[in-house]
Each structure stands twice: as structure tokens, then as C-alpha cells.
């Protein structure tokens, strides 16, 4: 996706549209820089969260995240619960623990769990470095914890997992037009 920066690409993931429609064009956008082509009843471009809320008003819908910018892109008024981990470097296990508890207690119909640690590592140590791959191994443990919580909640047979990111990176940066910055993994299971 272009531009290969966080708010633009997370908006694309949650809204199912590109910047020419949702209007977010900058890394840290809190509001669209361009007028959104459509607004929902909450004054934001339609999101997957709002579409589910409209279809199933009673649904439990959550979003837990480490990067604070996520809250501007998910339509928090359509969520049942949202939680921001203030400092993922000081408490790297907090998001996985919170997500696991939330899943077991509330059995959400939809939950987004957004980790920021790999992005931080890419900017400090570099992308495609041993440190970056160590961070991904750490993240794999948290994904396993979340999968186990889904199993423990008795939801595994009805769950689809999607693992992706907002953008790639090159050296210690992102936001450019290279293939390494634009391409992301997209893994679906269930």
C-alpha cells in the first residue's frame, strides 16, 4: 500500500478502502487529511467494527493495541471495549495477557489485537536484522497465548485468525515506495 505508513495502512485494514476514500494520508493521522468519501453515523469512514455493530448490535467487539494511533482508526463508538498498552517496552507481555483475559471472559465476535513492538525494533535495530527476527519470535509466543485463550474459551471452531501488519520496512525506516516497505505478510487460519 502507498504511502507505506502506519495510520494510512491501519485505516486501510480496518476500513477496507484506500486513502483516496478514507482520507488518511499521514503516518500519525488522527483525522483524515482529505475529506472521507462516506461517513458513518459516528462521523468516521465505515469500519469493520461499525459494520458488525450495525448487523449484530449485541455483539462483543474489542480492540487492544500498543500504538495509540489505532484508537483514531477503529471507530471506538462501535466497540464494546478498547484498551491501550501505554508502554509496550516496559510491559511487553501486557497486551497478550489483557487479550487472553478479554477473550476468555467476553467471547468477542471480533477482536483486533495490534502489537507495536516489531515496528519499534525495526526503527531502532533495523528491519531484516537478528534483533528484528528475535522480536518476531517473541511475538510468536504472544500469538500462541492468544490462540490458547481462544481454545480455552471454546471458540476455536468458530474463529478465523488473521495476522498482518500495516507496512514493511527497509533499514531503519518505512514510509517509502520500495517493495520492502509496501509488502506485508497476510496469514489467515481457521
Regions found by a protein language model. Name each.
Residues 68-83, 97-141, 145:
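Active-site His/acidic residue clusters
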Residues 138-179, 186:
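Metal-dependent active-site segment of extracytoplasmic phospho-/sulfohydrolases and closely related
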Residues 8, 55-62, 105-111, 155-161, ...:
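Loop/turn elements at helix/coil->beta-strand transitions in domains of secreted/extracellular proteins
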Residues 1, 10-11, 33-40, 51, ...:
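Second-shell loop/turn segments in exported
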Residues 2-5, 19-20, 67-71, 117-121, ...:
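Solvent-exposed loop/turn segments at secondary-structure junctions
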Residues 12-14, 27, 177-190:
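Substrate-binding rim/cap in mid-to-C-terminal beta-strand-loop elements of soluble/periplasmic
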Residues 36-98, 106:
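A substrate-binding/cap region within the structured catalytic cores of diverse enzymes
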Residues 1-56:
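Active-site nucleophile/metal-coordination loop of metallo-enzymes that catalyze phosphate/sulfate
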Amino acid at each position: 500500500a502507498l504511502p507505506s505508513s502506519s495510520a494510512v495502512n491501519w485505516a486501510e485494514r480496518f476500513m477496507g478502502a484506500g486513502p483516496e476514500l478514507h482520507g488518511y494520508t499521514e503516518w500519525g493521522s488522527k483525522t483524515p487529511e482529505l475529506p472521507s468519501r462516506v461517513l458513518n453515523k459516528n462521523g468516521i469512514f465505515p469500519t469493520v467494527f461499525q459494520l458488525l455493530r450495525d448487523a449484530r448490535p449485541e455483539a462483543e467487539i474489542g480492540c487492544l493495541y500498543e500504538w495509540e494511533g489505532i484508537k483514531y482508526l477503529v471507530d471506538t463508538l462501535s466497540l464494546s471495549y478498547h484498551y491501550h498498552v501505554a508502554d509496550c517496552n516496559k510491559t511487553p507481555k501486557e497486551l497478550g495477557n489483557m487479550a487472553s483475559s478479554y477473550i476468555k471472559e467476553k467471547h468477542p465476535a471480533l477482536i483486533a489485537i495490534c502489537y507495536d513492538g516489531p515496528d519499534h525494533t525495526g526503527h531502532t535495530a533495523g528491519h531484516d536484522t537478528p534483533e528484528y527476527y528475535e522480536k518476531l519470535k517473541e511475538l510468536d509466543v504472544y500469538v500462541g497465548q492468544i490462540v490458547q485463550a481462544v481454545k480455552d474459551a471454546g471458540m476455536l471452531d468458530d474463529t478465523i485468525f488473521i495476522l498482518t501488519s500495516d507496512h514493511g520496512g527497509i533499514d531503519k525506516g518505512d514510509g517509502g515506495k520500495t517493495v520492502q516497505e509496501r509488502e506485508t505478510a497476510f496469514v489467515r487460519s481457521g
